[in-house]
A protein has these predicted regions:
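Sec-dependent bacterial lipoprotein signal peptides
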Residues: 1-32
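Hydrophilic extracytoplasmic domains
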Residues: 25, 36-39, 56-80, 296-406
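Repeated scaffold domains used in trafficking and secretory/extracellular systems
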Residues: 61-72, 118-129, 139-148, 193-206, ...
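Short loop/turn segments that connect beta-strands within beta-propeller blades
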Residues: 104-106, 182-186, 230-234, 280-282, ...
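A short beta-strand motif characteristic of beta-propeller blades
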Residues: 52-61, 109-113, 130-137, 187-193, ...
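Short, solvent-exposed loop/turn segments at conserved positions within beta-propeller repeat blades
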Residues: 90-95, 167-176, 216-224, 264-273, ...
Length: 406
């Protein structure tokens, strides 16, 4: 989960927002108005050189909210957001996000763009006056949030802040821009506009997949819809299909859906399990995986190897007293955990280890740590191997020092 910091708003606007947050949201999802951006913004993407990108770095606290650097196939992408002048004839301040890519080892500038509206991170979404604000926590999800990288590291997709909602408008009236950038050049591959509440997005290696709804959930009155936008044929019309499940991630070629969202910060001792459905982009089922506890960027899935044994042990542990729980220990079957990559049919045993989402030289990846005796009677976490989302899935043991103290 990406770290965020509070947004500092003008005092008058802050008081009005605190009052608004105390008011229950109606089922119609109608919202009153007090906006970070006065008026409706059109999409504007401007290329920047190195000097312009450096000059765009904000001096205010808004930049503190931006995501940690994202690893791509071409380098590290950083984002910073600041207030900029509005459009022609406007005296209002608007927010824009500067997206910049630098070479991983040398920090050499590669490209940068300025995007308006700004990228919709958790805090900015939370304080927006529209139906999307209730989904602010979803914007920080690493696999389906406002900033995601494709498994091959070639594309970066960004959900932008939706327009201000006027009094009387409903969730169906909400309009949100989503922009996909080529991570090598910074060029816009595709920009789309979706309607309704945006529940999440995910990238395969060839498509942008967006889940929207008419409520804060896909089932029932939410009337969830997944829309697929091709990134290889950008002139192609999007396709869509209805769903009552949550979009939780994507492999290289399939979507991953689940009955409910999983915790986004499960690194060890994960207990909530679900079954994830693998879907083709036409909505047909490609398979399923049970015992899933976490979905990671790049298509890696964390699961219990024996879901029934793991569930039985968890139930016994919950029913036991505190003293009884101290003497309980799971069987090998109940404790065995795996990382699975369906695209390459790769399964790796990680029993007794911990996984962390880390940028690796090829793009999104995972670091696997294990407790190791330090010689002083205690243990320390040491990197064991790292995984890429672009190769054959073999554990990498080279250059582990890059993860020390990181």
């Amino acid at each position: 989960m990406r770290a965020t910091h509070p947004l500092r708003l003008p005092t008058s606007c802050t008081l009005r927002r605190l009052s608004a947050l105390a008011t229950a949201v109606t089922l119609a999802l109608t919202i009153s108005s007090c906006s970070l951006r006065e008026g409706t913004q059109s999409l504007a993407i401007t290329s920047l050189n190195a000097q312009e990108a450096d000059a765009a770095k904000p001096q205010d606290s808004i930049s503190d909210m931006d995501n940690q650097p994202l690893s791509t196939a071409s380098g590290l992408v950083t984002m910073s957001t600041s207030y900029v002048a509005g459009g022609t004839g406007s005296t209002a301040k608007e927010m824009a996000t500067t997206v910049a890519s630098r070479e991983r080892s040398t920090d050499k500038f590669q490209w940068a763009v300025s995007i308006k509206p700004a990228v919709a991170d958790q805090e900015r979404t939370k304080y927006a006056d529209n139906a999307q604000s209730a989904m602010s926590e979803n914007m920080d999800r690493s696999s389906t949030g406002s900033a995601v990288v494709s498994p091959d590291g070639q594309y970066l997709s960004l959900i932008l802040l939706p327009s201000e909602q006027q009094s009387g408008e409903t969730a169906a009236d909400l309009r949100t821009h989503i922009v996909v950038l080529d991570t090598k050049t910074g060029k816009t591959v595709r920009d789309v506009t979706v309607s309704g509440v945006t529940l999440g997005q995910a990238l395969t290696n060839s498509a942008l997949n967006v889940e929207t709804a008419q409520n804060y959930f896909p089932a029932g009155s939410g009337k969830g819809t997944i829309t697929i936008f091709s990134l290889t044929d950008t002139s192609a019309q999007p396709s869509s299909f209805p769903t009552d499940k949550w979009l939780v991630g994507a492999t290289r070629e399939n979507l991953m859906l689940a009955p409910s969202l999983l915790p986004d910060d499960c690194f060890s001792e994960c207990s909530i399990m679900t079954t994830v459905s693998l879907l083709n982009t036409d909505g047909s089922t490609a398979g399923s995986i049970s015992g899933v506890t976490a979905i990671h960027p790049g298509g890696w899935i964390h699961r219990f190897a024996n879901p029934k044994a793991a569930s039985d042990y968890q139930q016994r542990s919950k029913a036991a007293s505190e003293d009884e729980r101290k003497s309980l220990s799971p069987s090998r079957e109940a404790a065995e955990e795996q990382l699975v990559n369906p695209s390459i049919k790769k399964t790796i045993d990680i029993t007794g280890k911990r996984t962390f989402e880390r940028g690796v030289p090829t793009g999104p990846g995972l670091l696997v740590d294990q407790k190791t005796p330090n010689g002083n009677g205690s243990t320390v976490l040491k990197p064991v191997f790292w995984l890429s989302s672009t190769d054959d899935g073999h554990p990498h043991t080279e250059n582990l020092e890059q993860f020390e103290n990181n």
